[in-house]
Amino acid sequence: MNEHSCLLSVIIPCFNYEAYVGEAIDSVLAQQADDVEVFVVDDGSTDASWDRITAYGDRITAIRSQNQGSVTACLTAFQRTSGQFVYILDADDKLAPGALALIRPHLRPEVSKVQFMLQPIDHQGQPVRAPTPALDPTRTSQQMIDDIVRRGSYLAPPTSGNVCRRDIYESTGVPDYERTAVDGVQHLLAPFIGEVVSIDRVLGFYRIHSANESGFAKVSVERLDRVINRFSNRLAHLRQLLDSRGVAAGVSFRSDYAYTGELVLMRAIVAGRSPTRQELRSYLAALEREQAGLGRRLRQLFAILMYALPLPLARRLVRFRLNPLSLGRLQTVIKSLSTGGGRRGTTMNEGKS
């Protein structure tokens, strides 16, 4: 690491979030940290976002790019940063007061990522569901690697809940399969090359509002295909990164994880047909390998219903499954009924991409 660099670079990518970008910037500037630099990238907004951003003057570095997607926007800003660690904060999210004071002690050379819990909020800033995800601070990087091998991912928050060591972004570049998400292969790589620290406290706010919630209800075959392909491409990219570093040579990844198996069932329904018995069996077999307890039983139930229900009802079930607010309400009910006290997590990517 460059001994003359600052400790942390914050990058805030923005596209048409004039109503929220000021809150995001304010939440970082309010941390009162001298070793933090702030970059805000307007990715070709057509609203007043740029005016909101430039109003902060020299307290931030404002960058304007041509609507190339948040990945390219973030990496454009990254090239101008000097931080030993990088934090990407979505423009409609915000940090909690005092968050950086709790994160800073963990920003050590051997740490590849610090992750923390987020409180989902609506457009007015009101909580809409329980904090997510339920992180376990005792969980080790090796356990996270085991999770990736077993199910293709590990429990991690959306973009705004992660601070990554600089070399993670230096090594990944702009994947040709990824345009909108910066929390993909980067976060998969983290446990393989360092210690991942999990803070089981809410240190940020993750906004779910009409601009991103509605996307979950507008499901299409094309969108599901993109998600399925992106999941597979991330793992293939991860394998390339590990090989280039000479890391985890004996680790291999499957092609039939439960995450994509469930999406295959949904894709069939969206395409206008019921899932086949083989598609159902493949998904249920993956669940048996990867999960246990109440979470597995609920996903088994969802799968059987998607297979057995008439198409109109099955389509409604798919929309319910993919909607973050509906899923949050279901999780609240489950939590109230459960006496096991287990930590909850999801296999669905609930990001905004």
Give short role names for the model-derived ranges.
Residues 70-73, 100-168:
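Flexible acidic/His/Gly-enriched loops in nucleotide-sugar-dependent glycosyltransferase catalytic domains
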Residues 86:
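Short aromatic/hydrophobic "clamp" motif used to bind/position activated sugar donors
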Residues 27, 34, 42-51, 67, ...:
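A conserved acidic beta->alpha catalytic loop
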Residues 150-152, 180, 205-353:
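C-terminal subregions of glycosyltransferases and related glycan-biosynthesis enzymes
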Residues 48, 93-105:
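Acidic donor-binding/catalytic loop of UDP-sugar-dependent glycosyltransferases
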Residues 8-20, 24, 31-32, 41:
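A conserved hydrophobic helix/loop-capping motif in glycosyltransferases and polysaccharide synthases
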Residues 79, 141-219:
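Conserved nucleotide-sugar donor-binding catalytic segment
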Residues 65-81:
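Glycine-rich, basic loop-to-helix element that forms the pyrophosphate-binding segment
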